[in-house]
C-alpha cells in the first residue's frame, strides 16, 4: 500500500519563480501569459502568494492582491471601480497532473484562512464564460462565489466577475 501524498501549502519564495512561471505558462489562456519581470512584479504586489507542493514538488500556486494595489489588469480595475475593500485572486494555476485531486480546495481554504486572519472582507476573481471554463465555473459555484457582473476583455474573452465573503462556508 502506498503512502498518502504529502501536501504542503506555503508562501512562495524568490527561488520558486522559475517553477511558478512554468506552471503559469502551461495554463495559458486560462491565466494570462507573463514574463519573469511581470511575475516578479505580481509576486511583489501579492501579500498572499502561495505555492502548493506535492511530495516536495511545486504543482500549483496562487497570487492574491489587495484592493489598493497599482495593478493594471482590466479585470482587477473592474473591481476597484466598484468596490473599496476586497482581495483579488489574480491567478491560480496547477500543473495538469495535479488538477482534480482536491488541491484547489485545500489552497482556497488556506487563502480564506489567511484573509480572515488579516481581517480582509471579500475575495474577488473572474472566470471565463465565453469561451466558458466550465470546471472553474463549477468549482467556484461550489465554494459560494456569486457573480457580481460580467465584462468583455480586450483579449476577446467574456468573464464572470465573482466575489465571496471571507470566512463564509464553502
Model feature map: region roles:
Residues 6-20:
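A short beta-loop-alpha structural element at the N-terminal edge
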Residues 29-55, 63, 69:
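Active-site rim helix/loop that mediates acceptor-substrate recognition in acyltransferases
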Residues 63-91, 155:
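Conserved acyl-donor/pantetheine-binding loop and adjacent beta-alpha core of acyl/acetyltransferases
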Residues 81, 150-170:
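C-terminal "cap" of GNAT-fold acetyltransferases
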Residues 90-99, 129-130:
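A short, internal acetyl-CoA/4′-phosphopantetheine-binding micro-motif in the GNAT/acyltransferase core
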Residues 94, 100-113, 142:
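Conserved acetyl-CoA-binding loop-helix of GNAT-fold acetyltransferases
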Residues 105, 130-149:
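Conserved active-site alpha-helix within GNAT-family acetyltransferase domains
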Residues 115-129:
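Conserved GNAT acetyl-CoA-binding A-motif
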Amino acid at each position: 500500500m502506498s503512502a498518502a501524498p504529502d501536501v504542503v501549502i506555503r508562501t512562495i519564495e524568490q527561488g520558486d519563480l522559475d517553477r511558478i512561471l512554468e506552471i503559469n505558462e502551461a495554463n495559458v489562456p486560462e491565466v494570462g501569459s507573463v514574463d519573469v519581470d511581470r511575475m516578479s512584479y505580481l509576486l511583489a504586489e501579492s501579500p498572499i502568494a502561495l505555492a502548493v507542493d506535492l511530495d516536495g514538488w511545486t504543482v500549483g500556486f496562487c497570487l492574491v492582491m489587495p484592493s489598493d494595489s497599482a495593478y493594471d489588469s482590466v479585470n482587477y480595475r473592474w473591481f476597484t471601480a466598484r468596490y473599496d475593500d476586497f482581495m483579488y485572486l489574480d491567478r491560480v494555476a496547477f500543473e495538469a497532473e495535479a488538477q482534480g485531486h482536491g488541491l484547489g480546495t485545500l489552497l482556497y481554504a488556506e487563502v480564506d484562512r489567511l484573509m480572515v486572519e488579516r481581517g480582509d472582507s471579500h475575495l474577488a476573481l473572474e472566470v471565463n464564460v465565453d469561451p466558458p471554463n466550465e470546471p472553474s465555473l463549477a468549482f467556484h459555484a461550489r465554494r459560494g462565489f456569486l457573480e457580481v457582473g460580467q465584462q468583455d476583455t480586450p483579449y476577446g474573452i467574456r468573464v464572470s466577475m465573482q466575489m465571496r465573503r471571507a470566512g463564509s462556508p464553502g
